[in-house]
Amino acid sequence: MSLVYMNIMMAFTVSLTGLLMYRSHLMSSLLCLEGMMLSLFILATLMILNSHFTLASMMPIILLVFAACEAALGLSLLVMVSNTYGTDYVQNLNLLQC
């Protein structure tokens, strides 16, 4: 396995660890999710380019579309929570209080 793949997998692992450890603020969770999606996009693109599998060439673009939708929904949720509660704590996202 080359160093590029190892670095991308390590970036995904660091983002996943950050998501699991620093769950107090919504903004830090969104940044970790974006880091995970970016590393998945780069890994999928490199694997498709190296394997010359042209049928799956749309998969990274579809992944990027889902990442953009996730970012838009996350930022709208962040704006709504910060306007309602004044903070961006994840503990405010209890469904029983809404």
UniProtKB/Swiss-Prot annotation:
UniProt protein name: NADH-ubiquinone oxidoreductase chain 4L
Keywords from the UniProt entry: Electron transport, Membrane, Mitochondrion, Mitochondrion inner membrane, NAD, Respiratory chain, Translocase, Transmembrane, Transmembrane helix, Transport, Ubiquinone
- Assembly, per entry: Core subunit of respiratory chain NADH dehydrogenase (Complex I) which is composed of 45 different subunits.
Answer whether the UniProt record assigns the keyword Transport to this protein. Answer: yes
Tell me the compartments it is located in.
Mitochondrion inner membrane
Q: What Gene Ontology terms describe where this protein resides (cellular component)?
A: mitochondrial inner membrane; respiratory chain complex I
- GO: which molecular function terms? NADH dehydrogenase (ubiquinone) activity
Name its species: Ovis aries (Sheep)
Principal location listed in the UniProt entry: mitochondrion
Going by the record, the broad EC class of this enzyme is translocase
Note whether Cell membrane occurs among the keywords. no
